[in-house]
């Protein structure tokens, strides 16, 4: 039952978003700015998540061996 409730909730959110998009041309400037900020924030989070995942996967899945690091020893004072 939890799965059907979740699907119903997602469908409800999608319908409200579609209704909001359809009413956007008649919206007030404040609503346009608020909606634009929300969309911009959501897109930014998704893009940053995609970049983080791609960087993580590139380092984890990459089979190339990195160059061996040589430790640096301090020099003796003269």
Swiss-Prot record:
Its main location: membrane. It is found in: Membrane. The chain crosses the membrane at residues 32-52. Disulfide bonds: none annotated. It is a single-pass membrane protein. One of its GO terms (cellular component) is membrane. Pfam families: SMIM5_18_22. It comes from the Eukaryota. InterPro entries: SMIM5, SMIM5/18/22. Coiled coil: none annotated. Keywords: Membrane, Transmembrane, Transmembrane helix. This is Small integral membrane protein 5. It comes from Mus musculus (Mouse).
